[in-house]
Amino acid sequence: MCIRDSGLTGTIGDYGRFCQMLLQKGELDGTRILGRKTVDFMALNHLPDNKDMAAMGQPVWSESSAEGIGYGLGMAVVIDAATTQLLRSTGEYFWGGAASTAFWIDPDEDMFVVFMTQLMPSSFYPIRNELRVAAYQTLID
């Protein structure tokens, strides 16, 4: 199956380091890679009039709706956590891959998640939503 924008390769460790760098506002292992304001700008909703993606049309490849989800620079951004009807934080940013892979970064909880699998299509089973619920249920104060 040939899917546009798929086929990127890397390691889960590298993906984790990338997420850690974004969580730390552009810094990793004491080295500044991106400016703090650049990361903040990437994670803002850039859709017109601060609309969510549902207002722009429903996603085809996702098992969850787009209500409360905006779009930043290269990633989806939670603009209203309650509207998403999932456990998440406003300001969280994330993206999923064609084979149900996913990452999310939640600055409020100081956490990131990288999930690798090969379940096609990603809309077949809500595995990412189940992972999200499980991850957030483990958080304690």
PLM segments and residue spans:
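Catalytic loop of the DD-peptidase/beta-lactamase superfamily, centered on the K-T-G motif
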Residues: 4-141
